[in-house]
């Protein structure tokens, strides 16, 4: 890997260089993760483990960050039965979606090639004036010729994170995901232990609504700071770039 020399460069040069590097990470999550904690008070003789119903529904969450510390809109992908894979506009409106979140749909609930193409146009609405780089893993939808062609047309080069070293080279895995997941989990557990939560007839907590889930994502994403994002790139990428020739 070619060494990037930034010493002696102006602040503006460094800022412009860092702004050219983005990283996106898609991860599957559950609307109602399995609960192993008790919600009883400390000291109770009988302790019940009350969790949501057994049926779990998976969703995909995509988080994009920039080496300069910027964050982009968090993307939530819900499973939909629509033939087009699109969520109807009136349903989207009912979610009361926060400004820092985009909600999309697919028939599988996974990140599809159609969503990936839409993502590329969303992230890069115009061709980039200077060479720009997008760091991603080797997911099949990322390695498509169509994805490479779309990015190349916009002057964006795709850099694949080595499969065997994702935890080491993927910026979100270093700090961003850890911070986000901890915040999201704390909100879920607070909801689980709330006396106001609704329960089913059998005493199980009802699954959180999609609207609730979206707002947890929004709040947790807001809690990921610029410093956290920069630290992720420093730990995952730049320490390797500066050490290799």
Q: PLM features: residue spans?
A:
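Phosphate-facing sequence motifs and polybasic nucleic-acid/acidic-lipid-binding regions
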Residues: 1-244
């Amino acid at each position: 890997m070619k060494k990037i020399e930034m010493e002696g460069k102006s602040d503006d040069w460094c800022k412009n260089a860092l702004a050219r590097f983005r990283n996106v990470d898609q991860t599957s999550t559950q609307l109602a993760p399995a609960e192993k904690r008790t919600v009883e008070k400390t000291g109770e003789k009988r302790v019940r483990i009350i969790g949501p119903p057994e049926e779990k529904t998976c969703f995909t969450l995509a988080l994009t960050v920039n080496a300069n510390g910027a964050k982009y809109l968090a993307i939530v992908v819900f499973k939909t039965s629509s033939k087009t894979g699109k969520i109807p506009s009136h349903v989207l409106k009912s979610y009361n979606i926060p400004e820092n979140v985009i909600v999309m749909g697919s028939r599988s609930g996974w990140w599809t090639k159609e969503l990936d193409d839409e993502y590329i146009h969303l992230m890069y609405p115009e061709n980039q004036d200077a060479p720009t780089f997008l760091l991603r893993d080797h997911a099949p939808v990322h390695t498509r010729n169509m994805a490479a062609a779309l990015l190349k047309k916009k002057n964006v080069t795709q850099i694949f994170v080595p499969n065997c070293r994702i935890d080491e080279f993927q910026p979100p895995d270093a700090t961003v995901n850890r911070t986000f997941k901890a915040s999201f989990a704390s909100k879920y557990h607070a909801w689980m232990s709330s006396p106001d939560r609704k329960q089913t007839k059998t005493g199980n907590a009802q699954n959180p609504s999609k609207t609730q889930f979206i707002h947890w994502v929004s709040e947790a994403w807001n809690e990921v700071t610029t410093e956290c994002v920069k630290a992720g790139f420093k730990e995952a990428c730049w320490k390797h770039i500066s050490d290799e020739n």
